[in-house]
Amino acid sequence: MSDEKKGFWSRLVSGLSKTRDNIVSGIDSIFNGFSSIDDDFYEEIEEILIMGDIGVNATEAIIENLKEKVKENKIKDPAECKELLIHSIKEQMDVGETAYRFENEKSVVLIIGVNGVGKTTSVGKLAGKLKDQGKKVVLAAADTFRAAAGDQLLEWAKRANVEMIGGQEGADPAAVVYDAVAAAKARNADVLLCDTAGRLHNKKNLMEELKKINRILEREYPDAYRETLVVLDATTGQNALAQAREFSEVADITGIILTKMDGTAKGGIAVAIHSELGIPVKYIGVGETIEDLQKFDSNEFVNALFDVKQETKDSTEREE
């Protein structure tokens, strides 16, 4: 495991401590407190998972999966169920093999999210990560309605050493994307990252804006692979799920960036979003630096949640 990965892993483990207290300590008391596996046993686990923001749908699927495995393996001792439960949660969250296809093709990534969730910061961090992978990145500052969004993104562009187009407050976001596409094509960029607005309180305007941007991309950059990521604040729990649902009504969302995972008691929301909406969490953030945004890995996340020690082979397999 690289030093960067080790650092992220330890921050993730400590960052999920409140979520762990919220979920795991209660579950451990059930595993150790019950002498037999019965309906009450499953109901207690279900209650704790729902209280931990894992959500009703995900919890039901996890419990059903657990019941099947208990039956298959003829398990009688409740304490033996913990490993099966961990495995069931991991299965709910697998991002799939093509989740990061945009990294390997000429791509446009639209990033949307409401104010205050860490959207522009996430765009900057993602630019830095892609640049570190040797990709040629262009940023489009198309969130032109938020004061100083362009200035903030410019700081990140400088830090990541990538080019930024736009940034003028009040400009037409679609016009910024048009200019950025021209720049990306002229410079033969690998990835064009577009920081776009997320004014959910005015869904009609947002929908029109995204339609306009998408029309420009279809016309000007038809061969580019398209990705649309929504940035959500993990500390808002079920509110984050509601936002993801609303955004999916106005855009074809392909993934989630979940920020502020350090110090939230609501980390279980990562499971809920994936299960309820079928949208995978692709990145999680646990701090302020570029290294604090990492690809989501269900195995790592659930191990960190339950504080299961990482196996070395498990970690080295995923090193880039």
Language-model features and meaning:
Residues 1-98, 104-111, 126-128, 132-139, ...:
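Non-catalytic terminal/linker segments enriched in charged/polar, low-complexity residues
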Residues 90-93, 98-320:
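P-loop/Walker A NTP-binding module and the surrounding RecA-like catalytic core of P-loop NTPases
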